[in-house]
Amino acid sequence: RLVLEVXASVEADV
């Protein structure tokens, strides 16, 4: 879940 959250954060940043 932490990894998914980080990935989502990066995608949202883009």
Swiss-Prot record:
Annotated function: Has kinin-like biological properties. Causes contraction of isolated guinea pig ileum and relaxation of rat duodenum. Has a number of hypotensive properties: decreases arterial blood pressure and increases capillary permeability. Induces edema when injected into hindpaw of rat. May target bradykinin receptors (BDKRB). Does not lyse unfibrinolysed blood.
Tissues with expression: Expressed by the venom gland.
Subcellular location: Secreted
Organism of provenance: Lycosa erythrognatha (Wolf spider)
Top-rank taxon: Eukaryota
Keyword Coiled coil tagged: no
GO terms for biological process, alphabetical: vasodilation
Other notes: The molecular weight of about 4 kDa suggests that the mature peptide comprises about 36 amino acid residues.
Main localization, broad class: secreted
GO molecular function, one term: toxin activity
The protein's name: Kinin-like peptide-S
Source organism phylogeny: Eukaryota, Metazoa, Ecdysozoa, Arthropoda, Chelicerata
Family the UniProt entry places it in: Belongs to the bradykinin-related peptide family.
One Gene Ontology term, aspect cellular component: extracellular region
Disulfide cross-links: none
Keywords, sorted A to Z: Bradykinin receptor impairing toxin, G-protein coupled receptor impairing toxin, Secreted, Toxin, Vasoactive, Vasodilator
